[in-house]
Amino acid sequence: MLAVDLVRRGAARFAGRIAVHVEDRSLTYAEVDEAANRLAHVLAGLGVSRGDRVGLLLGNGLWSVSVDFACLKAGVVRVPLNGRLSAAEHTRMLRDTGVTLLVYGPELAGRAVELGESMDGLRLACLGESPHADHLDLMAAMRTASAADPMLPAAPDDVILILYTSGTTGTLKAAQHTQASYAAITANILSNLVSPGRDDVMLHAASLIHASGTFVLPYWVRGGAAVVLGGFDPDEYLDAVSRYGVTALNLVPTMLGMLFADGRAERADLGRLSTVVYGASPMPRPLIERALDAWGPRFVQYFGQTEAPLCLTVLDKDDHAEGGALLGAAGHPAVDARLVLTDEGGAPVAPGEIGEVRVKAPFTMAGYYNEPELTARSLGPDGWVRTRDLARFDDRGYLHLVDRSSDMIITGGYNVYPREVEDALASHPAVAQCAVVGAPDPTWVEAVTAFVTLRTGAQASEAALRDHVRARLAGYKVPKTVHFVDTIPYSPVGKILRRALRDPLWEGER
């Protein structure tokens, strides 16, 4: 099955149903599909052909889904750019992937012009009226383009998407996904996370050209709808749940924390809401317990990564209802994924021991773009992908993530995983956010070091927090130093950027 075939099947079956809601406007399946056809012809008229890379610098909007589908139908490779990244990062992404056409939204015209000026040969096209008259208005061009499906040939191994990792290690990597793997992502979501029907509606506030967009096709092929917000505002988000009859949410822990920050989430009208899917970063135990108390067992957690989206493991609603230790688990393996834990040499570890998670599944990447050596280190010839995540299985078969192998701290010969220390710190009532890294130490080589932000109006001393951790973990895991800071740095997808805290501590040491 190809991803483009899923688009065509959904359009044919549900032509008259509403597919997308944006504010007070909506589009039917037929309208989304026709716009995709027209945009595909516009792209072809710009000289973009099968296999060419097209950069996307877009916020969420009425035509976001049509743009994605247009790229599929035109046979081009989407290279989405996160608007929160720097111009230098955007430039590197575009250059490394050989992008010659950048499609941007009017609100990001300034960045688009900056990129155009820094890159010879980069053409710019605006999804709407641009403040720059010499840039093509794709919406105007779309109105006069053919509405017929271009019906270009497509093959399972055709690369259709290049997704850059969030760069928590400081290295941007371009994971490639194909027609077949993207269709498999849709099947993975339907098999493990949601099972929508024609009356189901998912709310999107994160960027559709990134991970959130993977939930569009599962609802599309079942006749459901997407409510698309321009960004995440807690009040607007909760209002949309009742306004549009939303049945499912897709969010990251940071978003859930913002929803519950002022108590409004407890008072919100949830209407038809039945499922809250979350993932992308660890969920603080106090937060999920509070959310469960308020909203009940509507929650489903997934663990995955850019190289193997979306769901390697799942912690389902029944698991959340059981609660207890299970709330700290990543879940049980997805029905369409094979997982194994290995040592540094690649051999399986004994039951209960910590090992690196490796996965084999139809939805894994086809390798990193133009990086054969990096691909060889991460993707074996037998199809197994190294995740670089350390984990263990419990006696019930649930996977428990320990940490990233690159984040592990070795202090006095003992291994310390930052996440377990962060979990202990986060259980203190005064702690809002925290991050743990290793700092250079003449005696221990690395010293466990914590960065903490306190809740508004709360107080806690360094000694109190160290005592709190000591009551829960071994002595060598207790932070030697606690730094109180205003903010903790996060990546665009909500992962702690430990390197931003760690690297300054090691200047001159390595």
PLM-predicted stretches and their roles:
Residues 28-30, 160-184:
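Conserved AMP-binding A3 loop
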Residues 332-336, 345-378, 416:
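Conserved ATP/PPi-binding loop(s) of AMP-dependent carboxylate-activating enzymes
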Residues 41, 45-46, 73-140, 432, ...:
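Structural core segment of the AMP-binding/adenylate-forming
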Residues 221, 246-251, 260-325, 338, ...:
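Gly/Ser/Thr-rich phosphate-binding loop
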Residues 183-201, 209-248, 262:
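Conserved AMP-binding/adenylation subdomain of ANL enzymes
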Residues 1, 16, 126-131, 145-164, ...:
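Conserved pre-ATP/AMP-binding loop-to-beta segment of ANL
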Residues 85, 102-104, 241, 249, ...:
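AMP-binding/adenylate-forming catalytic core of the ANL superfamily
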Residues 8, 16-61, 65-69, 86-91, ...:
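Conserved AMP-binding/adenylate-forming core of the ANL superfamily
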